[in-house]
Amino acid sequence: TAAPRTLDVFSYVEFCLWDAIDDSSNFQRNFSTGEVEVVESAIYHKTEYRERRDHYAVFWANAPVTSFDTSRDAFCGVYGGPAAPEAVKAGHCSNSIAHGWAPVGAHHFHLTLAPGEKKSIIFGLGYIENPVLEKFSAPGIINKARAEAMMARYATDAQVDTARRAL
């Protein structure tokens, strides 16, 4: 259009806890295990990584976020759902960090576009496995080297288009 436009863009993914049958039946355990970490626009789902897993998930975007959520209740609302999330209704996320309960990844971008301007945001969802001796980069810090390399491989539109054509 000929006028500047302001809009809010939200992303959302609900992480599994690595075992679909257990995820849907063992609520007492599941609601006490969820763990996440946020570094800039990357949300790391690291449930049980320290104790018994050698893998984690990462949900990222290639642009700086305005806000984020990692708690389903914070993003969707206690009695809400993905059809009409509370964060979207409010126009922003609350920067929640999930400790147990239902970990999610949600990004919020507040954008202003000049007339005729286009903006691309790349979202990625990845799964990372680390050898046991390489699980941590420092005591208690998950080794993010493989995740960072993956995010760097898909950081631009051209990189994503090239990867898609190679499929």
Where would I find each of the regions flagged by the language model?
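A conserved hydrophobic secondary-structure block that centers on an alpha-helix together
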Residues: 1-4, 102-103, 114
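Polysaccharide-binding surfaces and accessory modules of carbohydrate-active proteins
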Residues: 2-90, 132-167
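Short Pro-Gly-centered flexible turn/kink motifs
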Residues: 5, 111-129
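Short beta-strand element of the conserved SAM-dependent methyltransferase core
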Residues: 59-61, 107, 125
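Glycine-centered flexibility motif
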Residues: 76-81, 100-102, 126
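Active-site-adjacent bridging/hinge elements
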Residues: 89-101
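Beta-strand-rich interaction surfaces with strong enrichment in secreted/lumenal proteins
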Residues: 95-98, 108-113
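Substrate-binding groove/exosite segments of carbohydrate-active enzymes
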Residues: 100-103, 165-167
